């Protein structure tokens, strides 16, 4: 019954610069382009003065308010999809330290104000929202009082949503083998991929289920193989290293480096470490053992 009933506002913060001197201007500019595109896309449904109202505002939170007010005047509601909400905030924490990061995520920081505006209109205009990010750190710092969302990161219902089961990987390889694109036995390729790409699990309640293969890595392997009919020389896709670089910087600047280094050493030597996964924690508490282990989990290690 709700099909085609809502407008969709999709936003991504992945391209916002993390230079503290340019960040807010980049954020406002990025949001302005998104809101302008939204107004043009739905021009036949919105009041004719909507775009003008949006462009008269200087900051993103005010532009969002203008959009929401226009929708409310027309009796319309929207779905908000916010992708990589924490990208530039995490970069600030890694590259510029906690003081700059705190000014962004606490008090009257522009990103915090933007999310406050989102909350203000959830009962009138924003019918549903879907927010994605890398780690729970920024969400904890940004959303005190943002008690309108539920964290689905470790919900067992979604455990199999992103990765591939081994049966799915095998089906993919068998398809290309039948097409004559793969000359190696499928079992041989599975044995190559399994130590590198298998054993992912996204919920403690799913530990007894079959583990998942990293879908990005599997597709990287298959794409490389189809080009050369040989497995890739480097089994790890370099495009997936960004989060590991962030983690390395976090460890280097952390005052408790020695303690957390032992956790990494434990993973290297024993293949695992045990802890309770935290749904969220503030940046100032990253060094606490369970928080640090949780960060490793969210970074996919």
Question: Predicted regions span which residues?
Answer:
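Conserved P-loop NTPase "ATPase switch" module shared by AAA+ and STAND
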Residues: 74-104
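Conserved helicase/translocase motor-coupling segment
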Residues: 207-210, 220-300
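A short beta-strand-to-loop transition that corresponds to the Sensor-1 phosphate-sensing loop
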Residues: 14, 83-84, 113-139, 143-146
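Substrate-engagement module of ASCE P-loop NTPases
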Residues: 66-73, 100-127
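P-loop NTPase motor core
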Residues: 1-40
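Amphipathic alpha-helical segments of the small helical/lid subdomains adjacent to P-loop NTPase cores
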Residues: 138-144, 152-223
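Short glycine-rich substrate-engagement loop in P-loop NTPases that contacts/grips substrate
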Residues: 47-69
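Short secondary-structure boundary/capping segments
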Residues: 26-28, 94-102, 142-156, 219-236
């Amino acid at each position: 019954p709700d099909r085609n009933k809502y407008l969709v506002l999709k936003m991504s913060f992945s391209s916002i610069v993390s230079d503290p001197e340019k960040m807010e201007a980049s954020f406002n500019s990025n949001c302005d382009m998104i809101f302008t595109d939204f107004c043009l896309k739905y021009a036949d449904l919105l009041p004719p003065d909507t775009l003008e109202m949006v462009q008269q505002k200087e900051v993103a939170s005010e532009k969002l308010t203008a959009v929401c007010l226009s929708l409310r005047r027309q009796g319309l509601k929207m779905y908000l999809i916010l992708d990589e909400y924490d990208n530039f905030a995490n970069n600030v924490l890694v590259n510029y330290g906690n003081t700059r990061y705190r000014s962004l995520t606490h008090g009257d920081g522009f990103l915090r104000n933007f999310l406050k505006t989102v909350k203000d209109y959830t009962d009138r205009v924003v019918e549903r929202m879907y927010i994605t990010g890398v780690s729970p750190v920024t969400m904890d710092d940004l959303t005190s009082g943002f008690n309108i969302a539920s964290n689905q990161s470790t919900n067992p219902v979604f455990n199999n949503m992103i990765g591939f089961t081994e049966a799915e990987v095998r089906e993919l390889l068998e398809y290309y083998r039948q097409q004559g694109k793969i000359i190696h036995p499928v079992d041989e390729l599975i044995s190559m991929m399994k130590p590198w790409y298998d054993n992912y699990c996204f919920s403690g309640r799913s530990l007894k289920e079959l583990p998942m293969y990293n879908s990005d890595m599997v597709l990287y392997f298959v794409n490389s193989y189809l080009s050369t009919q040989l497995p890739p020389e480097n089994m790890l896709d370099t495009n997936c290293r960004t989060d590991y670089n962030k983690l390395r910087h976090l460890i280097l600047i952390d005052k408790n480096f020695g303690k957390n280094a032992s956790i990494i050493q434990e993973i290297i030597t024993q293949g695992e470490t045990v802890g309770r996964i935290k749904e969220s924690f503030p940046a100032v508490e990253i060094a606490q053992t369970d928080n640090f282990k949780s960060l490793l989990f969210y970074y996919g290690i």
